[in-house]
Amino acid sequence: MGEDELALLNQSINEFGDKFRNRLDDNHSQVLGLRDAFKDSMKAFSEKMSLKLKEEERMTEMILEYKNQLCKQNKLIQEKKENVLKMIAEVKGKEQESEELTAKIQELKEEYARKRETISTANKANEERLKGLQKSADLYRDYLGLEIRKIHGNKLQFIFTSIDPKNPESPYMFSMSINEAKEYEVYDSSPHLECLAEFQEKVRKTNNFSAFLANIRKAFIAKVHN
């Protein structure tokens, strides 16, 4: 074989080697590309499956929670049903007691109305009596130096003057009212008189109010001179 033929053979061998290596490089690149694509696909599939599993777990938990809630609701409904049935039975068993209670309430209402009317009548009578006392006060004022004022609590305040000759305008006073028993009730005086309780007892027995006022005035005069 001549040199030209050897050179041509070597050239052919080299060209074939280059083509083979290029083909191997291309195949290797394709294999690597396929491997990477497969990895990406598997990763995406794995993530998708993981999300799906988590979603299924969440749905399972929700279903279990719903079942638990449903059981609780059913239990509560059953308890309420039993309570309602019990209440119905109690109501049916207490119909007579309810009627008696209604009658008792009506009786109490009527009694309250009677008492309210009695109190109202007593208050009106007391007001009329106080008005009478106030009217009498106008007469006493000119002759005994007495002034009568209505103060809080439906009380009357009796104020005497011309008791002390040295100070005729100096006030001497006591207060009184008519209690629920329609009796005179005397309160403290200024200055204090030890005989107030005695005078109160006497006017309750005699109902002589003029004498009562005269005795109070005399007691104040005696206190000034003593």
UniProtKB/Swiss-Prot annotation:
Cleaved signal peptide residues: none
Location of this chain's protein in the cell: Nucleus; Chromosome, Centromere, Kinetochore
GO cellular component: a single term: cytosol
Family matches, as InterPro entries: Spc25, Spc25_C
Region of interest (Interaction with the NDC80-NUF2 subcomplex), residue spans: 1-58
Gene Ontology annotations of biological process type: attachment of spindle microtubules to kinetochore; cell division; chromosome segregation; mitotic spindle assembly checkpoint signaling; mitotic spindle organization
Region (Interaction with the N-terminus of SPBC24): 1-146
Coiled-coil region(s): 72-128
A family per Pfam: Spindle_Spc25
PTM-bearing positions, type Phosphoserine: 12
Region entry Interaction with the C-terminus of SPBC24, spans: 147-226
Family statement drawn from the similarity comment of this UniProt entry: Belongs to the SPC25 family.
Quaternary organization: Component of the NDC80 complex, which consists of NDC80/HEC1, CDCA1, SPBC24 and SPBC25. The NDC80 complex is formed by two subcomplexes composed of NDC80/HEC1-CDCA1 and SPBC24-SPBC25. Each subcomplex is formed by parallel interactions through the coiled-coil domains of individual subunits. Formation of a tetrameric complex is mediated by interactions between the C-terminal regions of both subunits of the NDC80/HEC1-CDCA1 subcomplex and the N-terminal regions of both subunits of the SPBC24-SPBC25 complex.
Functional summary from the UniProt entry: Acts as a component of the essential kinetochore-associated NDC80 complex, which is required for chromosome segregation and spindle checkpoint activity. Required for kinetochore integrity and the organization of stable microtubule binding sites in the outer plate of the kinetochore. The NDC80 complex synergistically enhances the affinity of the SKA1 complex for microtubules and may allow the NDC80 complex to track depolymerizing microtubules.
Name this protein carries in UniProt: Kinetochore protein Spc25
Species of origin: Mus musculus
